[in-house]
Amino acid sequence: MASVSELACIYSALILHDDEVTVTEDKINALIKAAGVSVEPFWPGLFAKALANVNIGSLICNVGAGGPAPAAGAAPAGGAAPSTAAAPAEEKKVEAKKEESEESEDDMGFGLFD
């Protein structure tokens, strides 16, 4: 978990970015002093150097992005469309699977002492 010193520097950097001010060690120190937080002297310089060549706006926007989404199932390549007779059979299979899964969800494994 982040320490108070780290959080103070992070919030200072976010405030500076929000005000469209360049993030520097001196400006981080000024905000931390104004907030009345005591921070080890190396933290503001560390954050200023780490954020010097980083686009903070894109960093904020991509925080939750875990990478590209998996591709959807491919469409059948060329050829005729599947027959309509096969579609109802597939629907019955899907319904049967849904019923089975609902039954298994209702059980929840409490039958051990029945």
Swiss-Prot record:
Phosphoserine modification, residue list: S101
Residues passing through the membrane, by range: none
Matches recorded under Pfam families: Ribosomal_60s (PF00428)
Domain of life: Eukaryota
GO biological process per UniProt: cytoplasmic translation; regulation of translation; translational elongation
Alphabetically ordered keywords of this record: Acetylation, Isopeptide bond, Phosphoprotein, Ribonucleoprotein, Ribosomal protein, Ubl conjugation
Biased composition (Low complexity): 69-88
Region of interest (Disordered), ranges: 69-114
InterPro entries (UniProt xref): P1/P2_N_sf (IPR038716), Ribosomal_P1/P2 (IPR027534)
A Gene Ontology cellular-component term: ribosome
PTM annotation: Ubiquitinated at Lys-92 and Lys-93 by RNF14 and RNF25 in response to ribosome collisions (ribosome stalling).
GO molecular function: structural constituent of ribosome
Quaternary data: Heterodimer with RPLP2 at the lateral ribosomal stalk of the large ribosomal subunit.
Family according to the record: Belongs to the eukaryotic ribosomal protein P1/P2 family.
Function: Plays an important role in the elongation step of protein synthesis.
UniProt xrefs under PANTHER family: 60S ACIDIC RIBOSOMAL PROTEIN P1 (PTHR45696), LARGE RIBOSOMAL SUBUNIT PROTEIN P1 (PTHR45696:SF32)
Protein name, per record: Large ribosomal subunit protein P1
Protein source organism: Mus musculus
